[in-house]
Amino acid sequence: MEERRVVEAAPAATVVLLRDGEAGIEVLLGRRSSRLDFHGGAWVFPGGRIDPEDYADRPDDAEGAARRCAVREAKEEAGLDVDPDALVHLSSWTTPEIAPKRFATWFFIGPVAGGVEEADGTETEALRWFR
């Protein structure tokens, strides 16, 4: 039997964005482009890979890099501003070793600080607030 190679998990961050809606608290989800090979067409929270720049010359600050990534992804994918200090670390998990693509993801939750919501049209096709 051939031994299967385990793919290294890429560091990533996701942000669960909240706002006060007319009928109560709402959460933002974006529909991933159907052209993407990883969960194309799925409704997801904004997020993505942690870039080297997210470490801001602090290679040992994994949580800080993840926060900066979450803020950046909210802006890139949804046009929304997020205060990194208002984010709460919700959870972290890593995709199982059997998956062909793996991520070690930091999950944050926090309020939207401003901006105009707009799907980027590349990774995210649509945005919707859910209650």
Task: Give a label for each model feature.
Residues 1-131:
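N-terminal leader/linker segments that precede catalytic domains of diphosphate-processing enzymes
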